[in-house]
């Protein structure tokens, strides 16, 4: 069973938090709520529809943090001519992913920006 103020879908519980935090603080906050709780992860379009039905009425049109970060670190980047990336001019800020509550488009955002968020807990 889900905690009393969490919503249930499939084998998971969800809670929308309106307070705005940066990505790291939001993930830490989720972990403090319950053992096994983290920022939201999506595994099906049906799950997305459920989450949108919960977040949109509360947050209106806004972004929420989801549990993706540093997507580029897993990529082996190279130039279009096939040469290896040895020089780069990336900003020092790490990128995290926020989901738009209106249509579930995922956007890279600076991890230091503050957004509301959704915590997810496996039952």
From Swiss-Prot:
SUPFAM superfamilies attached to this UniProt entry: C-type lectin-like
Cytoplasm recorded as keyword: no
InterPro entries tied to this protein: C-type_lectin-like (IPR001304), C-type_lectin-like/link_sf (IPR016186), C-type_lectin/snaclec_domain (IPR050111), CTDL_fold (IPR016187)
Free-text tissue specificity from the UniProt record: Expressed by the venom gland.
Keywords, alphabetical: Disulfide bond, Hemostasis impairing toxin, Platelet aggregation activating toxin, Secreted, Toxin
GO MF term (any one): toxin activity
A GO CC term attached to the entry: other organism cell membrane
Residues annotated as domain C-type lectin: 9-120
Record has Membrane as a keyword: no
Disulfide linkage: 2-13, 30-119, 96-111
Function of the molecule: Snaclec that induces platelet aggregation without any cofactor in a dose-dependent manner. Its platelet aggregation effect is blocked by echicetin, suggesting it is a GPIb-binding protein which binds to the same or a closely related GPIb site on platelets as echicetin.
Family statement drawn from the similarity comment of this UniProt entry: Belongs to the snaclec family.
Name of the featured protein: Snaclec purpureotin subunit beta
Source organism of this protein record: Trimeresurus purpureomaculatus (Mangrove pit viper)
């Amino acid at each position: 069973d889900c905690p009393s103020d969490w919503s249930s879908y499939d084998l998971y519980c969800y809670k929308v938090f309106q307070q705005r935090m940066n990505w790291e603080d939001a993930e830490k906050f989720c972990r403090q709520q319950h053992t096994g709780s983290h920022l939201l992860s999506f595994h099906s379009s049906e799950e997305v529809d459920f989450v949108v039905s919960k977040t949109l009425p509360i947050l209106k049109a806004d972004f929420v943090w989801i549990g993706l970060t540093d997507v580029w670190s897993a990529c082996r980047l190279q130039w279009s001519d096939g040469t290896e990336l040895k020089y780069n001019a990336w900003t020092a800020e790490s990128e995290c992913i926020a989901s738009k509550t209106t249509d579930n488009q995922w956007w890279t955002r600076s991890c230091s920006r503050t957004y509301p968020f959704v915590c997810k807990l496996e039952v």
